[in-house]
Design a protein with these regions (language model features):
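Feature captures the catalytic ectodomains and active-site-proximal regions of enzymes
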Residues: 1-193
Length: 193
């Protein structure tokens, strides 16, 4: 048997659990490449769904490399989100667009631009749909990738994740025209926001 250096961390009171305890309905949606991120990982490494938590998996395209189809399944994911928003069934919808990361890993700059343009178009549709219902949209990321494709030190194409700052954008009618700049969040603690 293999010895393990660190015990498995039991993550409790995830956002999903907090929403479920508050009897709020949740939708988690992504295409194949990021499905585990909106389900298993978002649930603290647990497979079990909470009460009121629905999952939607949209198949990723069957291509050998995502630079061949940089839009991936973003438009299909977006249609399902817009339909869910207009259905007024959910209090919280979590989506992970795979394109910036997965196409970013190809290092194909032209394809990366197309991927970002596709996601930008999709976010516009989602934001408009949510704002029509006086909802809030939060846009963020867990790492960078698409924004830096050239390593200045090596002169090589960079296909890896970056540690660059990521956006934290809150969109809602009550926030129109406000910009809080670049605050530092100590240790990633969002409770102070």
């Amino acid at each position: 048997p293999m010895e393990i250096a660190f015990a498995t961390e039991n993550i409790v009171n995830t956002l999903g659990e907090v929403l479920a305890k508050a009897n709020l309905k949740q939708l988690r949606i992504a295409e194949t490449e990021k499905y585990a991120h909106v389900t298993y990982f978002f649930n603290g490494g647990h497979e079990t769904k909470s009460i009121g938590e629905d999952h939607v998996l949209v198949p990723s395209p069957a291509v050998s490399s995502y630079d061949q189809k940089p839009e991936m399944s973003a438009f299909e994911v977006t249609k399902k989100i817009v339909d869910a928003v207009s259905g007024d069934k959910y209090d919280f919808i979590l989506v992970n667009f795979a394109n910036p990361d997965m196409v970013g890993h190809t290092g194909n700059f032209k394809a990366i631009i197309k991927a970002i343009e596709a996601v930008d178009s999709c976010i516009d549709k989602i934001v408009n749909s949510v704002l029509l219902r006086d909802g809030l949209v939060l846009i963020t990321a867990d790492h960078g990738n698409a924004e830096q494709k050239y390593n200045m030190q090596t002169g090589q194409i960079d296909k890896e994740h970056t540690t660059n700052p990521v956006p934290f954008i809150l969109i809602g009618k009550e926030y129109a025209g406000r910009n809080i700049g670049w605050p530092t969040i100590a240790g990633g603690d969002l409770s102070i926001i």
